[in-house]
Every structure is written in structure tokens, then in C-alpha cells.
From Swiss-Prot:
Gene that encodes it: coaD
Molecular function GO labels: ATP binding; pantetheine-phosphate adenylyltransferase activity
Organism: Methanothermobacter thermautotrophicus (strain ATCC 29096 / DSM 1053 / JCM 10044 / NBRC 100330 / Delta H)
The keyword Nucleotide-binding is annotated on this UniProt entry: yes
Protein name: Phosphopantetheine adenylyltransferase
Predominant location category: cytoplasm
Taxonomic superkingdom: Archaea
InterPro entries (alphabetical): Archaeal_FAD_synthase, Cyt_trans-like, PPAT_arch, Rossmann-like_a/b/a_fold
Record GO biological process: coenzyme A biosynthetic process
Amino acid sequence: MKRKYSLVAVGGTFDRFHKGHRRLLDEAFRVGETVMIGVTSDEFAAAKGEGIEPCSVRMKNLEEYLRDKDADYHVMRLDDPYGTTVTDEAFEAIVVSRETEPVAREINAIRRNRGFRELDIITIDMVNADDGIPISSTRIRRGEIDPMGHIIKRIRGALRRRRE
């Protein structure tokens, strides 16, 4: 099947690999012949807070998911928000979540300043957990949900009954 773009970028921390990550990657593979996947380095991810899995673990989990994909892909470490999207003219599109869409706009501003063609930005909605709140690595780390978005524990107070 011919896909719309020759080279597509997608990036993230990919901590606690979850259903939202799968959705993001599946969209990149749906539209791209070759998908370049950037995974934030330990140093870059440290700015997001504590408890993030080491880059080696995150890349291993990602590779396990990608193993069965019928597409050409490359996984690389990201030391900044942009990776090679601002230095490689060959990229045609970037797949992002609503949360990371502003970074894609920054990438396009840098590409424009360098005389590169802007990337088509493909934005996907966040994937909600069973409680209707988006799945996130933070929620998984807190023990609220599992990687598929199923509720693990109720938030304190949500189970309290009003005393009469």
C-alpha cells in the first residue's frame, strides 16, 4: 500500500509505554513509508520529573511494540525537542498529540527560517482512560491507571459519602 508521506517524524518520552503511545505510532505508520521515532534521552527526560524509566528501557519497550510493524522505521535518541526535523529537509510530516502540537509549530518556524519546506502536522486526540481522563505516563506512575487506561485506584475523596 502506498502511503501519503515518504518520511514522517514522531517523538516522545514513551515512558510507561501505553495505549496513547500506540495510537500515536499507529497513525505515523498509517501515513508514512518510513517513520523516524525520536525517544527523549535520560538527560532531556530528567526535566520532566522523577520516576521516568531509563532511555534503554523505554527504547526496548518501543522496539517490542514495533517488532511486528510492516513498515520501515528508525529509532533515535532525542537530546532536544526537535531532533533532526530541523536539520533534515527530507521530512514531510510530523505526527503529534494535542499536547505536543505547539512543538510541531516551533519546528515549522525553524524549518521556515532555514528555507526548508514546512512539515504537514498530523494531530491526534489524546486517548482517554476508562474514567474519561486522558491516559498519561504520569497517571500510570501514580498508580491511577494501567497502560491500557483501566482504573487501578480511586482518587481519595471520590469514594467518600457525604455525611448527613
